[in-house]
């Protein structure tokens, strides 16, 4: 009789370990994933959701990106370098001042009034319309995406417009 009780206790303990250890591991892994996702979302200069939502008509999403030129054309990346923004052919690069006045800039989902009061603090380069160019990218079989790019100076702006012509 004592042997039977001992066996049952041993079996019960092993069964619990077999079930709860993997569950605990999965829970910890999920917790790390959620924390990493939140940190990345909050601290990343460009949230993926905003990149994919940038095809809204009449709106240009302002992205702090860097541009490099090579034999393959222009490559746009966010300032951290995590997200490759280029997903199609670059159609045009124009100074913001040359665009129609109805175009509205957005920064992280909020409207940005160039040269006017804004609803939230935005980087200075966003409100300096003289140094912003707009890159239009056309994806195969999809709508054109537009990105507002900050240029550090007039020479860079002119160079970008030359590449886009």
Model-derived features: where do they sit?
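Conserved beta-hairpin
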Residues: 54-94
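Short, surface-exposed linear segments at secondary-structure transitions and domain or protein termini
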Residues: 15-19, 93-99, 153-164
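Non-transmembrane, membrane-adjacent beta-strand/coil modules in membrane-associated proteins
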Residues: 12-15, 77-148
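Short structural boundary motif marking the start of a folded domain
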Residues: 3-5, 65, 131-133
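N-terminal membrane-targeting/pre-transmembrane regions
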Residues: 1-38, 124-125, 139-146, 152-154
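Short, solvent-exposed secondary-structure boundary motifs
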Residues: 50-60, 115-117, 125
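Transmembrane helix-loop junctions and nearby membrane-interface residues
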Residues: 33, 37-40, 59-63
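Hydrophobic alpha-helical transmembrane segments
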Residues: 37-51
């Amino acid at each position: 009789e004592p042997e039977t009780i001992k066996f049952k206790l041993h079996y019960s303990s092993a069964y619990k370990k077999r079930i709860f250890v993997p569950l605990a591991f999965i829970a910890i892994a999920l917790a790390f994933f959620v924390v990493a996702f939140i940190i990345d979302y909050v601290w990343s200069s460009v949230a993926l959701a905003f990149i994919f939502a940038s095809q809204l008509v009449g709106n240009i999403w302002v992205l702090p990106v860097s541009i490099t030129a090579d034999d393959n054309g222009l490559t746009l990346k966010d300032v951290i370098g995590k997200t490759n923004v280029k997903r199609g052919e670059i159609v045009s690069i124009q100074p913001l001042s040359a665009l129609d006045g109805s175009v509205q800039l957005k920064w992280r989902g909020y409207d940005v009034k160039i040269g006017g009061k804004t609803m939230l603090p935005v980087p200075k380069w966003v409100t300096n319309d003289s140094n912003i160019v707009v890159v239009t990218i056309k994806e195969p079989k999809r709508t054109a995406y537009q990105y507002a790019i900050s240029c550090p100076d007039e020479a860079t702006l002119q160079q970008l417009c030359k590449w886009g012509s």
